[in-house]
């Protein structure tokens, strides 16, 4: 009908090619990642042969200014709005883990040089990490990655994604599209652990309430969950609602007030994190300074470090949040 026989033959040939590519690899057939991009309908049917499919409803790069002109906010608001369009408006039944888009982007051609400081860059990567995407192409200009400590941040975030991917791959949208200026985020759960991100895309303080139930992917009946911070941007990490020592259960809800542009990312687990960070390396860098490397990220507080027989007059934290200079 109207030339559709050609389309059928076209894709049958491509499927034969995909199959031949995997067959040629023998026992390593599943080590090949096939990403289907231009002019491919985003149907889960293709996941029989490919691993990821371009979302198709989005430009390579786009900006959406919801009265927050920073590049961090415009880039996140644009792409996450496209996710809401894909999942909610078009109602495509497609696992987010296998959805491809052109993120992250930090390159000269995109006119982004000098447009994100280190905290913005980490927030950019961490927020998109909670989308659950399995396939990342890093659209970076190497000269721009020398700004601040972006190479270190990039490596740290990718390690975190790899360590938590069994949870992240189950990501679901929560809230409403950032195009409306309303809070939103992603929720991912696996077994007795979960990761939730929330973001306020607007220039106003917003209240956000969401349920802890199956609508956000939480396993039914899960109880006794401890919450810990993964990352926070434009927020006071000592806010009462995040430091109260109470547990979360299935059927409850989370309500919070988000500042303009604020991002919070939490991890939930039935097992409390009671183990203190451990020292990996301590070395002298000058007659009056030490570098301390820990095995996990830390938040600097007064009095947290002491050196026998010496006064600690200043501390600084590297971009990976694990290396402290005293």
What does each model-found stretch correspond to?
Residues 1-5:
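Active-site groove signature of glycoside hydrolases
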Residues 320-325:
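Aromatic sugar-binding surface patches on proteins
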Residues 297-316:
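Short, surface-exposed alpha-helix to beta-strand junction/turn motifs within ectodomains of secreted
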